Amino acid sequence: MRLPLSLPALAAGVSTLLSLGSVQAAPQFVNGVTIPGNQLDLSGGTSVNNGRLGFFSDLFYDPNRNQWWGLSDRGPGGGTISYNTRLQRFRLDVNPSTGAIANFTIDQTILFRNGAQTFNGLAPNPSNVLGNAFDPEGLVVLPFNGHFLVSDEYGPSLYEFDRSGQFVRAFAMPENVQPRAGATLDYTATPAPAGALTSGREPNRGFEGLAISPDGRFAYAMLQNGTVEDGTVSGGTFARSMYTRILKFDTSTGNAVAQYAYRLEGAGPAPTRGRGISAILALDENRFLVLERNNRGVGVPDANLNEPDKKAFVIDLSGATDVSNVSLSGASLPVGVVPVSKNPSALVDLVANAVLQDPSMAALGGRGPEKWEGLAIGPRLSDGSLMLLAGTDNDYSVTQNASGTQFDVYYNPTSGARVQCDLETPLNCTSISTTGSVGSPGDVGNLPAGFSLIPGVLTSWRMSEADVGGYTPPVSTVPGPLPLAGAAAALAWSRRLRSRENRGSD
């Protein structure tokens, strides 16, 4: 069903009543949908670099408007090819009893703009000027005005946009996350041994996740990994910290008011296999769901197919120390510093065997996608259960070589084989090994049968409030033009309906 109403008063008033019907003991995988890798968005573009749908660098469900949003990142060029950054509004059929999803449809594509100029995925140039360079990775809708708040990896940045995608303001960034080579801002430098970056966020490891408190007063931006200074350099080689940072921002002022330490999974002393966080989702004013993943799974080179690890954990900021002025380097935190508390057991395992073997996931051939990056809690189900939606970033199913030549990446779910071919033409294909390395150019010839572009993936999970210790949605307290209905109507939803709001544009 496409739930027809989004009701602030209803959501707030009947949440306790609805939650009484939730009886399952743990989150349950319901089903998945796979979306063809060649699908276009509604921007009007028809090529890979201006119109191919960029999948879910983040997801957000707006309960005030009953709308789903998906974020595209900096584009297929990895920061080397011009791409107008954008946001997608989409629909899903949601079975009100089971939470099963179907019929993914794009309804609206919004470009991010600063006046007449679009924010672009090209890397900053010159390297000390951020300009309109933008690599969107985290998304929320502000409950008090409906604006979009988007986090970025280049800066890192936190920008507010209005409903048309027009830039409103930039939040102030603390000094310790700004990338510097010595005293000079440098948005493209890398740490040792190859580069000169000495402090701030690592490149391509900026604000990967973003969450909003239920009342909209605070936004929480999370670095994919810790800062350069949180790591260590030994023998000229940089090693990341086992800790990363959650930054708390006051949305009224745009200023950071605290930072918290979050420990990644693993024995250390440094995270392995590219481990970092991909998403953060608020459960209430103190508790969050954080998605961690490694760099293994079905993806473009250099993704290794072996041993993907993608899990979401419940965390609590209550009692955590503000580490705004504390280094997170070393095997342990300084005496007296308390990190966020983290449930030792994952709430969900996105690549559990039972998930990958489900018939709805046949397009993956029993193998897990590399980049799970989006999490959102959707509409309540008819018994009061919560629906959790998870989504992947397929990198547009595009890769490129050192000279900037792009290739489409194709996947065979039966064999698990991958090949890369001429862009938008399945010719001159080259093999990709299980470990992600690329063979001799053209060693496969034209695209063999059984291959298709890497799909985007959405999965639905059903869970009770008890599974997550309760949930408070970001519901607006500002009156608006949305239709009202009673709690009885919510309990009576049992047919597939299309949301009239979701059909329209904002």
Residue ranges and their predicted role:
Residues G13, Q24-A25:
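Long, low-complexity, Gly/Thr
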Residues W493-D506:
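C-terminal membrane-anchoring or membrane-association module
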Residues S476-R496:
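A short, hydrophobic C-terminal helix/tail in secreted or cell-surface proteins
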Residues A9-S19:
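Bacterial N-terminal signal peptides
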Residues M1-L10:
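Bacterial N-terminal signal peptides that target proteins for export
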Residues S19-L20, D152:
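Intrinsically disordered and other compositionally biased segments
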Residues A25-V475:
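Sequence/structural signature of beta-propeller domains
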